[in-house]
Regions:
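Repeated scaffold domains used in trafficking and secretory/extracellular systems
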Residues: 77-86, 125-136, 169-181, 197-207, ...
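Blade-level signature of beta-propeller repeat domains, shared across WD40, Kelch, NHL, RCC1
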Residues: 282-301
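Conserved Ser/Thr-centered positions that define the repeating blades of beta-propeller domains
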Residues: 110-111, 156-159, 220-222, 260-264, ...
Length: 301
């Protein structure tokens, strides 16, 4: 009887081996493809969205308001910056007041009409502040000043062209100045006057007339009792002549591009003279006004 191997006969309904291999390979490829697709989609960045423009609802940029130009108000120098100017027989004296205990005064003398000046401030006496300045005995000078560490009120006089000074009590009785102990009082040879304002400065006197500056206005007294306005605006300095007439140095931009010097019955414009610096004015022996303003020293004619 013939022998039949079991391997030579396949069971009915079984799938051939090669077909199984093909199916497995197809499945592997399908799974790999799906995995690659998933990874690719994960790594791809989302499309960039265009920025959205937010509409404005009537927003307007405010118009800048121009800053108004401040009005410049002129006023006479007061306190340490106050100036004094005096002359006699061709000798000139000038000074800045200073402030006793803090700002040193400066006193100078000239014999060549202000071309050169010599410092004659008596520092060796401890001068602290100058309150008035006037010529004496033709070519000498005198002043009312606060002296020493305690600011003692004294009259001072020189007989040596300003090299040496000595106290003199008669000067206090004959001088006009603002009382340092009471700035609202004007001391005169005829007595003490109440000032016409709260901050008087630039007081000068001559032949019974006393004149003082209040801000940029000026007043005068001829009876040692009452004051009357000069009726001039912008007064920076004044002086009183030997016959009691008042001359002023003024800032008046409407009529003068510089310093306007107003004498009784006449006015002279000195061009290019600063009106924003301390000023002093006086009359020489011929009655001609001289002005010391800033670094300028000049006559009107």
């Amino acid at each position: 009887m013939a022998y039949r191997s079991s391997t030579s006969r396949r069971s009915r309904g079984s799938v051939p081996t090669w077909v199984s291999i093909v199916i497995v390979a197809v499945l592997i490829l399908a799974v790999g493809g799906l995995s690659w697709l998933a990874i690719t989609r994960t790594q791809t960045p989302p499309p960039t969205e265009a920025p959205r423009v937010t509409p404005t609802m009537g927003v307007e940029t405010p118009t800048a308001t121009p800053t108004p130009t401040p009005t410049v108000t002129v006023a006479a120098a007061a306190g340490p910056a106050q100036r004094f100017l005096a002359t006699s027989e061709g000798v000139w004296w000038r000074a800045t007041a200073g402030q006793c205990g803090s700002i040193e005064p400066l006193l100078e003398r000239s014999t060549d009409a202000g071309q050169t000046w010599s410092d004659v401030t008596p520092r060796y006496l401890g001068i602290g502040q100058i309150l008035s300045l006037s010529p004496y005995a033709a070519d000498q000078g005198q002043m009312v000043a606060l002296m020493g560490a305690d600011c003692t009120l004294q009259g001072m006089r020189t007989f040596t062209d300003g090299q040496f000074w000595e106290p003199n009590g008669d000067i206090l009785a004959s001088s006009t100045y603002i009382d340092p102990a009471n700035p609202l009082a004007v001391v005169t040879p005829a007595g003490t006057l109440d000032a016409p304002c709260g901050a008087p400065t630039g007081v000068r006197a001559g032949d019974g007339t006393t004149a003082v500056i209040c801000g940029s206005d000026a007043s005068q007294s001829t009876d040692a009792a009452t004051w009357s306005p000069l009726g001039q605006a912008g007064v920076l300095a004044l002086t009183v002549s030997g016959d009691g007439q008042v001359t002023t140095a003024r800032a008046d931009a409407a009529s003068c591009d510089g310093m306007l010097v107003a004498e009784p019955g006449a006015a002279t414009c000195i061009p290019s003279i600063p009106t924003d610096a301390p000023v002093a004015v006086t009359l020489d022996g011929e009655g001609v006004p001289w002005v010391w303003a800033g670094d300028t020293f000049v006559s009107t004619r």
